[in-house]
Amino acid sequence: MLVQQLSRVLSEPPTILPCVGINVRHYKDDGDVERWVELINLAFRNGKPAMRCWTEPDFRQRIMAHPDWTPWNLFLAHNKHHQLVGSVSLVFRQSPDGPHPALHLLAVRPDARRLGIARMLVAMLESAAWQRGYREIVLETHAGWKEAAQFYAAVGYQLRAPTM
């Protein structure tokens, strides 16, 4: 699978533009796991190339079991009907010079796209990293996901180096 690595250097605190009717909170309890899995599977189901379906055990093993997991690192966007419409997680990737914050699994429901939810979630994640003293955010996305690549470029992420 060809993966694009992108990064953004933050030169000032990120500006968070709120979305009308959307509230963001952090992971609260086990009820969030089922809603998150549903969101991820819905958001990525038509991706080309496709992403395999996630399960609740996947969430517990790949998200919650991560060494730096805290509820504060998972951002959940809800609409006025309390439906989960978007999510992003902040993870830390280890490197020789210490941990680096990474944007992980940004997802927005297809019927809630182009409303500014993804942009707001990215800004909130960047703000959380900024408050912890980090000035660069990295991410990986599949090279075939053109819409994702266009979005990340629009919010200031630049290509690093492709890997296999």
Give short role names for the model-derived ranges:
Residues 76, 83-92, 100-102, 107:
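Conserved beta-strand in the GNAT
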Residues 71, 93-103, 113, 132:
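A conserved beta-turn-beta hairpin within the catalytic core of GNAT-like acetyltransferases
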Residues 44-63:
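Conserved GNAT-fold acetyl-CoA-binding loop/helix
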Residues 110, 139-149:
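Conserved beta-strand-loop-alpha-helix junction that forms the acyl-donor binding cleft
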Residues 23-38:
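A short beta-loop-alpha structural element at the N-terminal edge
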Residues 129-141:
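Conserved GNAT acetyl-CoA-binding A-motif
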Residues 1-21:
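Acyl-donor-binding surface of acyltransferase catalytic domains
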Residues 108, 114-127, 131, 150-154:
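Conserved acetyl-CoA-binding loop-helix of GNAT-fold acetyltransferases
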